[in-house]
A protein has these predicted regions:
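N-terminal maturation segment of proteins
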Residues: 1-179
Length: 179
């Protein structure tokens, strides 16, 4: 909780975009571990996909607020995330294939559910295209040329990833010795 409060105070959510672990990936990755054995599982997936456009709209608005406050991610990260998004939103990308190959462990999906899933997957693709266009036309032009965010930001990110505080200097020195 302390870390979350520190991150909020540092406004890291206003520039939360990178190529590894940010909402751009998390919103898509949420489907990776969802159960797919039954028609009910696929119905839940479809409902969650129907909410994806609103989630992406909210994410875009958060990044816009960062732009207003001049708290922006690195341009290199923005450009690479645009490339990642193409793999999600392409007609042969994640959402299209996921919906096209949807099937319970036994039998077939009801036709109405298959259509709903297809429609919601298409809406998710369009939402990701909207995100890519925002990144390309609005965020990339004002994004930072500087990678990273300095020692304090790195220390917070490290604590979040590890779940513990580490001595960054000691860790760096250890890495040099291990070469």
């Amino acid at each position: 909780l302390t870390l979350m409060l520190e991150q909020h105070a540092a406004k890291t959510h206003l520039r939360d975009l990178n190529v590894i672990e940010s909402p751009a990936q998390q919103l898509r990755a949420a489907y990776d571990l969802m159960p797919t054995d039954t028609a009910e599982d696929w119905s839940i997936i479809s409902r969650r996909m129907s909410a994806l456009p609103a989630a992406i709209d909210g994410y875009i608005e958060t990044l816009r607020e960062g732009m207003r406050q001049q708290i922006v991610p690195a341009r290199r990260q923005v450009v690479e995330v645009i490339t990642q998004i193409a793999r999600y939103s392409d007609k042969g990308g994640f959402f299209a294939v996921f919906a096209a190959e949807a099937a319970p462990a036994e039998g077939e999906l009801p036709a109405t559910l298959a259509r709903e899933l297809h429609d919601n997957a298409n809406a998710a693709r369009v939402a990701y295209d909207t995100l890519a266009e925002f990144l390309r036309s609005e965020l990339a032009p004002v994004a930072s040329e500087q990678d990273g965010g300095g020692r304090e930001q790195y220390a917070r990110a490290s604590r979040g990833f590890l779940g513990a505080t580490s001595d960054l200097g000691e860790t760096y020195e250890w890495r040099l010795r291990e070469r």
